[in-house]
From Swiss-Prot:
GO biological process, one term: thiamine biosynthetic process
Source taxon at top rank: Eukaryota
Role noted for this protein: Is not required for thiamine biosynthesis.
Keyword Secreted among UniProt keywords: yes
Induction: By absence of thiamine.
Classification via InterPro entries: Haem_Oase-like_multi-hlx, HMP/HMP-P_kinase_dom, PM/HMP-P_kinase-1, Ribokinase-like, Thiaminase-2/PQQC, Thiaminase_II
Family: Belongs to the thiaminase-2 family.
One Pfam family, short name: Phos_pyr_kin
Protein name: Thiamine biosynthesis protein THI22
PANTHER family: HYDROXYMETHYLPYRIMIDINE_PHOSPHOMETHYLPYRIMIDINE KINASE THI20-RELATED, PHOSPHOMETHYLPYRIMIDINE KINASE
Signal peptide annotation: 1-19
Amino acid sequence: MVIILLGLCTLGFPRTAFCPSIMTNSTVSINTPPPYLTLACNEKLPTVMSIAGSDSSGGAGVEADIKTITAHRCYAMTCVTTLTAQTPVKVYGAQNIPKKMVSQILDANLQDMKCNVIKTGMLTVDAIEVLHEKLLQLGENRPKLVIDPVLCAASDSSPTGKDVVSLIIEKISPFADILTPNISDCFMLLGENREVSKLQDVLEIAKDLSRITNCSNILVKGGHIPCDDGKEKHITDVLYLGAEQKFITFKGQFVNTTRTHGAGCTLASAIASNLARGYSLSQSVYGGIEYVQNAIAIGCDVTKKAVKVGPINHVYAVEIPLEKMLTDECFTASDAVPKKPIEGSLDKIPGGSFFNYLINHPKVKPHWDAYVNHEFVKRVADGTLERKKFQFFIEQDYLYLIDYVRVCCVTGSKSPTLEDLEKDLVIADCARNELNEHERRLREEFGVKDPDYLQKIKRGPALRAYCRYLIDISRRGNWQEIVVALNPCLMGYVYAVDKVKDKITAAEGSIYSEWCDTCASSFCYQAVLEGERLMNHILETYPPDQLDSLVTIFARGCELETNFWTAAMEYE
């Protein structure tokens, strides 16, 4: 626009019609690095070099490797073996890099740069031969080596595919710290297809590959062969540690998605990065698997239209620098870099209650209804719940409240106003009082006398999942998101007991009656009213285009609360 205006001014148009008569000039002060981050001044970053083909669309190859290595706070170097014109739709063209250039790149990188780990992906015959020479020259000083044998891609794009397979086995796999083949790669390395119908088949493949490739450690990736235990599908990756004659099976959640492009490259790069950071091989593999499964589950939308196999989200855990800069205590450039204005959307909510909108939202309602109509509350109300189940609930709730207090303190630290901070501290204090009540109940009702008993309570799966959720939201989320995550706990107990208030037949003075009375107290009802007002306030200060995030957070909180009570019902 500036160029167009200047052009118009030079063509004889009146200057005042298009150009401002007075030019403004403002000076913006750039902040120094955040104080804590300066502790890492001249940080010695672990270095990882990727030797692989490129993916011009960024989903796989060296592009995926660079993203992955960077996401693991390592320094990425590259040696491109093949240039490709490709997207998740198809490969449009490919051009191998000449052997001389590959050799020059490796020489330059290894001569002038530190290199902790080398990771390989799709290799050409030339690249394998050059790498073999360099590994021999380096001797005992060679970096660790992670080989992702991208054999299907190599055989599909190159007439020398079979040569690549034999050369990998002969020339570089004996130097490798680990090979990470998928099941198709395994068959090509073995020289035969095999039936894979049970875990034992995969174990045998891993052990045979170790022998054939002369590489001690083999990770057989299970993404292409999801297992079914009769209840649900899951992904099974098998790590064979040859020196220890040991298998480690990693069982992960199966995600029904087509966005898996580049997952294999990413896993090998994640393992290489973890090794560069000094983790053991088994730790590095675990970290790589979880990173990739998270990247798949979270996903990303970057293609113009639906594709058969889309890319994964390599940067799901990476922070946006500008967002942190805008909230920095010393940020003074608000005139030059204004914050996005937020228009409240309460007037668009039917009935003017964000809380009521949430509990009736299609994403939330099934979880909310299951929560506030739970059998646990009904059994407490009529006094028929087994005492051991209620004791289990009290013990789990005790540990939950400890984390709840921690989260409230984090919430307070992110509160926008002093009034909000004070409310968060009051809630934390109420939770602390409830902790005291739980201690009393365990002593007086359940005869707990051991002073160390509370420290010995083990966290059940439902509690671990719930606390993990709240703590993660408190660390990564903003004030509004944390408050919404805590809201189901604040509101649900009162609503659940209110539904059975006319059916409370538990003996008066019993622990069940006392619990119901507490949830039905005027204090708790007042807290619910305050909670509804707070939710409306949050809606007014949260970007309307991101409202679905709050819906999802609240729905998940209701689901976790339901699971918490279910765990008590199922305790034996």
